[in-house]
Every structure is written in structure tokens, then in C-alpha cells.
Amino acid sequence: MPLLILLMLLAAGAAGAESATPSLHIGVNYGANADNLPSPTSVATFLATKTTIDRVKLFDANPTFISAFAGTPISLAVSLPNSALPALADKATGLDAARSWIRANLSPYVPATNVTLLLAGNEILLSTDTNLILSLLPAMRRLAQALKAEGLTGVRVTTPHYLGILAPSDGIPSNASFRAGYNTKLFPAMLQFHRDTGSPFMVNPYPYFSYRPETLNYALFRPNSGIYDPATKLNYTSMLDAQMDAIYTAMKKLGYGDVDIAVGEAGWPTQAEPGQIGVGVQEARDFNEGMIRVCSSGKGTPLMPNRTFETYLFSLFDENQKPGPIAERHFGLFNPDFTPVYDLGLLRDGASVAPTPSPNPSPNPSPKPAPSGGGKWCVAKDGANGTDLQNNINYACGFVDCKPIQSGGACFSPNSLQAHASYVMNAYYQANGHTDLACDFKGTGIVTSSDPSYGGCKYVS
């Protein structure tokens, strides 16, 4: 361990011993789709010595980021891209492929870096690619076998799910169930995998993407009349509580109420489109304070009282190069100089709020967006084959943020392959230098000078 980090950790520990304020276990998502962030090493030192954040979730397996946390007490969750899963699921070669990936991406850094979770893709079930969906659980099994074979028994395997895995319902938790098909063909076996391996079932609940002006207080943990569940005789005054208990109910109906639930990401932006109601610093603080209270304080939810949940706030920093609506770039908890965007009580007692950041910019784990596309956009060609468009979505979402096309997102409606593919193809095109090649997508994309934005759905350019 570098001497400077060791001394800072010892000093931080001494300061913490004098504090009467208990530290809550909380994690954070660390994305770096920005050009103004401090180096991963300075980020790791800051989190380990100045904050109560004790775990970090990465969206890839960038070695610079993984090695930056060596010698710190921070637990790390590392992600594989969606595109890697089919090869890992292969019955004949999947285990060898999984072991090769682990040898290349984890073994050189563990145990110096405390990697505790390996995430098999992200929100795979958002896809309609049957092959990708069928690859998910076999790939998770191969990864678990490979980790054991490589001696990395402290690393657990899971995958983050979006809330669309639940069947449409009236929002009352006791009525929740998994979607038809998934509730019989996928989740019983997946939940058994989690039970057998001791890994959590990870979900990404996002009240931000589900609220309406009339439900804002319900989403932000503010006083409201709530929603009454007649089956359990419980009154819900928090949307997050209801979402978590809906997941729990669906799991319990399959006989797996004992499996741990983890929150892969959830947060609230501080800026959004002009005129959007319910977005700002106070709203972000209210939501994140409420989520920490529910997930990390031991309060739990109405159906899961006194429980804690492994939770990762979204996100560590604003990301000024993320495509999509304004809000996508403004979920950050800290500024690039490490000062808080707002106070969540995450700084250790006595910690300076303005340590000097590294002058070196963070390496970008995602393709770096080029300057403005100069009024050009990439969209799906009229008449493009639906299978091709879905493949385009699956591919592009491995590189760009696809939350806007998820249920509740600014670009979800119209819910069509043509619209969703156009949005993510354009995001990929802009992030890769807006060259004609970046819009080709095997002949299904076309460059246009007509802005395809509509309503609240803004196409980056």
C-alpha cells in the first residue's frame, strides 16, 4: 500500500473513533463519462479517507479504476458488458471463456483490490433479444464456477434488473408478480442460483422515472396520504418502499423471500429540462436521504422491517459527456473538486470538503464523445428489420446510457423498436465521432440533418 494512502487511512480511522456519529454502509456508482473528473487514484483515496462510502460499483472492468482501489477498504463491484454473455453461456466453451476473462480482468488485481461482486451485464431483460436473455443465467453459472476454479471465492455473481421485470400492476405491492414467462422459466432458477451462492438479487428501482407531478411527494419521502395495501393492511408513503416490497412479494410468491435484495442504482438529478417539475438540489437531497434511511439504517420497508440492503447511490459525479436528456448528466453527489453538490452526511467528521484533486483527468472507460455533431443525427432507416433494430439496441446499450428508452424514461414513448433504436443509435453515433461508419449499423442507420427530438425526448448532437 502506498505510504500516503496508509497514513491517510490511519488518520481517518482515528478521527472516526472519536466520532459519536455511526457510519452507515452505503455504496455509490462511479461512472466517468466526463472530461473534467479527477484521477481514479485520487477518487479512491478521497472515498477511503474522507467519506463513509464503503463500496463502489463500476460499469466495466477498466484496470486503471480497479487498481486505483488497491490497498483501500472499499469493496468493488465490477461489470461485464452485455455482449460478453453469449460466449460465456456456451456449454462446451463457456467455462474456459469465463476463466480467461477472470484471469485477464480480475486475478491481477485481487486481493489487493477488494472485489466482492461481479455483475453479468446490466438490465439484460430490457432486451427482446431471446439469445441474450437465454444466455444470462448460464453465463452467471459459468462465472461463479470460474471464480471458484480461479480461487476468487470472495467474489459473488449477480446481475442488475430494471423494474420492468414485474408484471404491470396497480402499484399495490401485494399484487406484484414477475412478468409472465419470467415467473416460471427464468426467475425460479435464477433465485435458486442466488440462494445457493449467497449472492443478492439486484434491482435498479428509480422513482425518478416513475413519478408524476401529483406523486412527487410520494416519490421524495415527503408527507403524503400514501397508498393503502388492503391485503397487508399497510399504508405506503414512499414509492421506493412500495417498489422494494413489490420485488420482495414477487420473490416470495416463488418461494424465495429469503434471498437478499441489493439496490444496484437509484438516484435523483439536480438539473433537468427547463420547466420540469420536481428536479433540483432539495429534491435530490430528499430522495437520497430517504433511500439511505430505508436501505442502510436498518429501518427497512413495511414488508421487510429492520433489514439493510446493499445499496449503490447513483452517482458519484455529474457526467458532462453523457448523451440524452439534461438530467442524465446531473445525478452527481460530488463536484470534481470533491466538494459535495449537497450535504448527505457522507463526509467523515472533521474531513475537509475540498481536497486538492489530481491535475490528471480520469481515463474514460466508455467511448469519449467527440465535439458536437454539427447538426447531424443518426436514426434507424424506415423499413429496417425489427431483429436488426433490436440487435442495434443491444449493441449500442453496451456503450451508451439507455435509461431514457426504459419505461418511465423521456424517450420510452412511443414504445417501438424504430423509436428506441433511433435514440440509442444516435447516442452511439455522437459518442463515436459522428462518422458515417458509426451510423452504419450494417446498413440499417442513416445520417439526417433533421433533429429527431420530440417533446421531452432530446437527441444529443
Curated annotation (Swiss-Prot):
Annotated GO molecular function terms are:
glucan endo-1,3-beta-D-glucosidase activity
What are the annotated GO cellular component locations? plasma membrane
PTM comment text: Contains two additional disulfide bonds.
Induction is noted as: Associated with aluminum toxicity.
InterPro entries per the UniProt record, alphabetical: Glyco_hydro_17, Glyco_hydro_17_plant, Glycoside_hydrolase_SF, X8
Q: Name one Pfam family in it.
A: X8
Question: What range does the record give for the signal peptide?
Answer: 1-23
Q: Which reaction does it catalyse?
A: Hydrolysis of (1->3)-beta-D-glucosidic linkages in (1->3)-beta-D-glucans
Active site, renumbered: 123, 265
EC assignment = 3.2.1.39
Keyword Hydrolase in the entry? The reply is: yes
In Gene Ontology terms, what is a biological process of this protein? carbohydrate metabolic process
In this chain, composition skew of type Pro residues spans: 356-370
Region Disordered: start-end pairs: 350-375
The protein's matches in PANTHER family, at most eight in alphabetical order, are given as:
GLUCAN ENDO-1,3-BETA-GLUCOSIDASE BG1-RELATED-RELATED
Under what name is this protein listed?
A: Glucan endo-1,3-beta-glucosidase
